[in-house]
């Protein structure tokens, strides 16, 4: 083999090696993209069942109805003895209640367990007559009549349960912001005493949009 043939053969070998080295990353990239897509789908599936401890939006990631927004209030139940009850009427801020004829579509309760939570609680929201004093007997009867959905939230050895939301639809009732004082959040501590540092309830009231102030507070 003369020198020119040897040089040509060497060039061809280098070309083949270069072609191989270029194709290898391409194949790896394709496999990585497939794996990333699979992990992304898996993460979305798992995320759907996770508790929403940080909750920047209404109903997790669900959007409000067109033309609606929401107002959040936070309730921290006091100590509730085993087998006893707690009730608190919904009191929205004055800046919202002045638009008392704006319609309300949904109420959502989100249970936020604190690090010491190790109990079982039942949570619901009910329309309560103004004459009711939210006594233990009255709240017990409302839990028993089955007239409203109830969220049973409990501690699990593997961590807190995924389902931490209760959604109450008021669309058919044509309820408005002025009606909210007639509704109350009710809690039943089933198995043991619920301490004050175990639980926080976030109540989101979805209502028609209200005008926002264009003047800074004094």
Swiss-Prot record:
Signal peptide: none annotated. The N-terminal arginine-rich stretch does not seem to be the major RNA-binding region that allows formation of an infectious ribonucleoprotein complex. The lineage of its organism: Viruses, Riboviria, Orthornavirae, Kitrinoviricota, Alsuviricetes. Keywords: Acetylation, Capsid protein, Ribonucleoprotein, RNA-binding, T=3 icosahedral capsid protein, Viral nucleoprotein, Virion. One of its GO terms (molecular function) is structural molecule activity. Pfam families: Cucumo_coat. The modification N-acetylmethionine is found at residue 1. It is found in: Virion. The keyword RNA-binding applies. SUPFAM superfamilies: Positive stranded ssRNA viruses. Residues 1-10 have a biased composition (Low complexity). The keyword Magnesium does not apply. It comes from Cucumber mosaic virus (strain FT) (CMV). InterPro entries: Cucumovirus_coat (IPR000247), Cucumovirus_coat_Asu_sf (IPR037137). Residues 11-21 have a biased composition (Basic residues). One of its GO terms (cellular component) is ribonucleoprotein complex. Capsid protein. Probably binds RNA and plays a role in packaging. Belongs to the cucumovirus capsid protein family. This is Capsid protein. Residues 1-29 are annotated as: Disordered.
């Amino acid at each position: 083999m003369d020198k020119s043939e040897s040089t040509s053969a060497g060039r061809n070998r280098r070309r083949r090696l270069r072609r191989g080295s270029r194709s290898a990353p391409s194949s790896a990239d394709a496999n990585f993209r497939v794996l990333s897509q699979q992990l992304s789908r898996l993460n979305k599936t798992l995320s759907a069942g996770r508790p929403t401890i940080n909750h920047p939006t209404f109903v997790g990631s669900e959007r409000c109805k067109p033309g609606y927004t929401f107002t959040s209030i936070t309730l921290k139940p006091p100590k509730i003895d085993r087998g006893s009850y707690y009730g608190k009427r919904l009191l929205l801020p004055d800046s919202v209640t002045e638009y008392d004829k704006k319609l309300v579509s949904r109420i959502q309760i989100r249970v936020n367990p604190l690090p010491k939570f190790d109990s079982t609680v039942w949570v619901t929201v009910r329309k309560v007559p103004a004459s009711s004093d939210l006594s233990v007997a009255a709240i017990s009867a409302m839990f028993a009549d089955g007239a409203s959905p109830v969220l049973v939230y409990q501690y699990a050895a593997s961590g807190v349960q995924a389902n931490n939301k209760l959604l109450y639809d008021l669309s058919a009732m044509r309820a408005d912001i002025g009606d909210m004082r007639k509704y109350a959040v009710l809690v039943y501590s089933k198995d043991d005493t619920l301490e004050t540092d175990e639980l926080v309830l976030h109540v989101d009231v979805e209502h028609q949009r209200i005008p926002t102030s264009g003047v800074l507070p004094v």
